[in-house]
Amino acid sequence: MKIRHIITLLTVLGCLVCKAQTPAFPGAEGFGMYTTGGRGGQVYHVTTLEDGTQEGTFRWACNKSGTRTMVFDVSGTIVLQSELKIKNGNVTIAGQSAPGDGICIANYPFVIACKNIIIRYMRFRLGNQALKVNPSAHEGDGLGGMDSENIIIDHCSVSWSIDECLSVYGSKNITVQWCIASQSLNNAGHSKGAHGYGGNWGGSGATYHHNLIAHHISRTPRLGPRPGTQTDERMDMRNNVIYNWIDNGVYGGEGMNVNIVNNYYKPGPDTKTGAKGMRIASPGIRTTDYTKHDSSSPNQWDKMWHVWGKYYVDGNVNTKYPQVTEDNWTYGIYNQIENSKVDNTFTQETKDTMRISLPISFEAVTTHTAEEAFERVLDYAGASLYRDALDEVIVNDTRNGETTYTGSGCKRGIINSQDDLKPEGAGDDWSAWPELKSKAAPSDTDGDGMPDDWELQHGLDPNHPEDGKAADSQYTNLEIYLNELVEKITTDQMAGGVVLSGQQTTGIIVPFRSRIFPTSNRVYTLNGSQVGANYKGVVIVNGQKKIQK
């Protein structure tokens, strides 16, 4: 399949907007790619798995203020005793620094309530254990955050939510990339009853790419505007893998501007047949009833009353229904809309205006075909520096079209509690949370986050804590160390892709030169379609226009 995108007029090297900015880390892409997080700030070491406010806990580090980076001197599961809301921004949470199998946050929600945050290689596996003790304990997301700005979530694994698994949305300049959102809990104790939802996605410049969304009843994702961003919702959703959605799948998008490009939809054993199994997305609107438009006091959503979104949809694959792959719009979009549910506003004019021929503006993302993305995501998504037992199950289920776990009264692949994973005959000490073994933390004499041995190898002084803040042309020494820990994953996951970005422009549309594979020699026509190497005519090769005869 060709990568069929209209892409930006400017090459990466010539981009006037971004040339002076440094990505959050190598491999950071999309609208949140220039988040700075804790760059150049203080370093806080998490030295214990206990939850509390004492020095060395994760909660203590989260509650600190000022520009900072959290590194881990231990691996394992941190069982929260109450919700943890991080309110002070300018922070990097470097899960890849944990010695051993990594970190998991459990039992209570972790909520992003700050600006300028980088989170990498973490697990958030909520569970309903706290609700069994106290039914009003929480109704949380696995990883949530909204009404903020400058956020990038990279290589995180999220599961067992009471509400949605992964709902980082309604903010400005955000990226969620290379994550796994799986096994939301169905009947886990939510006050509204059955849930089992993947997440709400959207924002004023929001990118979601190369994520795996598996084993959910609905919202895989919900395209969800927020009151503060509803008039400027711009979202790019590409190269995601969506498996075993049971009912609604992707829907919403009221008044949003959305690219849905090269995603891989794989219906599972109990995904509904017919239209919902064919679904790419079911766009909706804010109806009269929803907005109270005809009342004396319309609500906050009324400003988007009857406003249809605009969508660029191309290159998406459905493994069960080839007609959807061949014609994304007829079967995957138009046939999903029930006119009676949108105040009978779904007319031919609506069809014509909601479908756009150029993508909405989006920041650079290494883009694969949907089929390539399926393999890349299954190989590298989630907290994959060490992939734990649950992620292994989710990936294998997705690859093989299987459902390893099912809860009582649930559709195949859906669970009510993490305890539904308990094998027959397991003892009282069994835990659903995968064991994460720790190793001894490397010696870091000056506490700057970089091991002594690494500092010596790079000509630094292990007794000089300011070394970590020193910078080359782009990154601090601490960032260079943290980036090196996952360098191979970053390089391998992007192989075979082309770095694309897009603006709605006039004139010739020129593909980006790939920053990762600058000599890939892929050939494009002037409208952005990839063609064979022997194509004759005016083409673009590595960001340069040429004539092939």
Ranges and model annotations:
Residues 1, 20, 506-511, 528, ...:
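Terminal processing/anchoring signals of secreted or surface-associated proteins
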Residues 23-70, 525-531:
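Acidic Gly/Asp/Thr-rich repetitive segments characteristic of extracellular carbohydrate-active
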Residues 58-66, 78-94, 103-120, 126-149, ...:
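Extracellular beta-strand-rich solenoid/capping regions of secreted or surface-exposed proteins
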Residues 90, 95, 115-126, 147-160, ...:
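Right-handed parallel beta-helix
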Residues 105-110, 132-144, 160-168, 189-203, ...:
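Extracellular beta-strand/beta-solenoid scaffold signature
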Residues 234, 238-426:
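Extracellular beta-rich repeat passengers
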Residues 427-504:
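Extracellular calcium-associated, cysteine-rich motifs in secreted modular proteins
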Residues 498-525:
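Residue-level detector of functionally pivotal "anchor" positions at catalytic/ligand-binding pockets or at interdomain
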